[in-house]
């Protein structure tokens, strides 16, 4: 497997719609010159933005967390320019960008150091060959203080790895349960 460069990422976004909307360079400030957590294409990856839709975990119903029978009431919906995650809790969000992963590519997501250095961890499973959709992001606040996540700013970096051989069965071929997801998507058993 080979990691793909900014040139390849830009070409695939333009020719195949791999990332929409696509930012061809690194954005580090808004139109007023205010600093942002960067997003857009980088040397060997793409820094994604968080949309303004969040689901913050709460235990007001004293539910058991069960991935096979997840209680949707365990989340409080938040919409806004930022989200506050309670101490030792987590929130779900989604990327602004919609992805279409080629059949011979596997995409890995890593958190941005700006958040990691504040004790905020981003977790995303790999984007498999021929998966498409908005990426559901999980933010864990590992601190004992409330943590802030900013909408419309960079939150994680996608790395694209091209295989030397096309897979026999892609995510789309398997009829993956998260294929084509839009919005923040909760666990599906």
Swiss-Prot record:
The Gene Ontology biological process terms listed for this entry are: dUMP biosynthetic process; dUTP biosynthetic process; nucleobase-containing small molecule interconversion
KW Nucleotide-binding (keyword) present: yes
List the Gene3D superfamilies hit by this protein, alphabetically: 2.70.40.10
Q: Which reaction does it catalyse?
A: dCTP + H2O + H(+) = dUTP + NH4(+)
Pfam families assigned: DCD
Look at the named UniProt entry and state the broad enzyme category this protein falls under: hydrolase
Q: Which residues bind dCTP?
A: 112-117, 136-138, 157, 171, 181
Signal peptide limits: none
What InterPro entries is this protein classified in?
dCTP_deaminase, dUTPase-like_sf, dUTPase_trimeric
EC number in record: 3.5.4.13
Record bears the keyword Ligase:
no
Pathway(s) it belongs to: Pyrimidine metabolism; dUMP biosynthesis; dUMP from dCTP (dUTP route): step 1/2
Q: PANTHER family, from UniProt?
A: DCTP DEAMINASE (PTHR42680:SF3)
What is the protein's name according to its record? dCTP deaminase
What's the source species for this entry?
Alcanivorax borkumensis (strain ATCC 700651 / DSM 11573 / NCIMB 13689 / SK2)
Q: What is the lineage of its organism?
A: Bacteria, Pseudomonadati, Pseudomonadota, Gammaproteobacteria, Oceanospirillales
Q: Which gene encodes it?
A: dcd
């Amino acid at each position: 497997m080979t990691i793909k460069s900014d040139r390849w990422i830009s070409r695939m976004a333009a020719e195949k719609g791999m990332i929409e909307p696509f930012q061809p360079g690194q954005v580090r400030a808004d139109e007023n010159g205010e600093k942002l957590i960067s997003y857009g294409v980088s040397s060997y990856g793409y820094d994604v933005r968080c949309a303004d839709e969040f689901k913050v975990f709460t235990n007001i119903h004293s539910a058991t967390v069960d991935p096979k029978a997840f209680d949707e009431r365990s989340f409080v919906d938040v919409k806004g320019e930022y989200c506050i995650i309670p101490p030792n809790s987590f929130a779900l969000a989604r990327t602004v960008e919609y992805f279409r992963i080629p059949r011979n590519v596997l995409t890995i997501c890593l958190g941005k150091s700006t958040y990691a250095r504040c004790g905020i961890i981003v977790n995303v499973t790999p984007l498999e060959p021929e998966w498409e959709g908005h990426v559901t992001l999980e933010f864990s606040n590992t601190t004992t203080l409330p943590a802030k996540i900013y909408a419309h700013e960079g939150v994680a970096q996608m790395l694209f790895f091209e295989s030397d051989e096309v897979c026999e069965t892609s995510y789309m071929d398997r009829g993956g349960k998260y294929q084509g997801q839009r919005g923040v998507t909760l666990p599906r058993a």
